Amino acid sequence: MIVDSSAMVAVIKREPDWLSLSERMDSADRLHISAASYLETAIVLDGLRNPARSAELDDLIEEIGMVIEPVTVEQAKIARQAYRDYGKGSGHPANLNFGDCFSYALAREKREPMLWKGDDFGHTEIRPA
């Protein structure tokens, strides 16, 4: 399973649906996050100016055995095309941002379902987890 930054942030911030997202992660055989999505998650959490919350990201990744996947050249190409097709300003309802495009690319490259929060990826062909 690929995990988007939106799901990671929701779990760490204990947003209303965090438990459901956490349970889905717990049920997965393998968990992967793009290095770009890892950074995006860290930026959001660091912006809260709460050091304990920021530390939870790395603690959670280690605890659940999530693999931070390096961005490959192929993923960069897939992400570029995703932005053209689904990105902000494209007119497509998915309205993917920079970080979303890397989650999308990793899910496409690995042919894995993705866990996310929101409705952006629901407008693409990515399988929900």
Please annotate each region the language model reported:
Residues 104-129:
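Acidic, PIN/NYN-like endoribonuclease modules and their adjacent C-terminal/linker elements
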Residues 8-9, 38, 121-122:
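A generic structural signal for short hydrophobic patches within well-formed alpha-helices
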Residues 1-33, 46-61:
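Short, well-structured N-terminal submotif of metal-dependent ribonuclease cores
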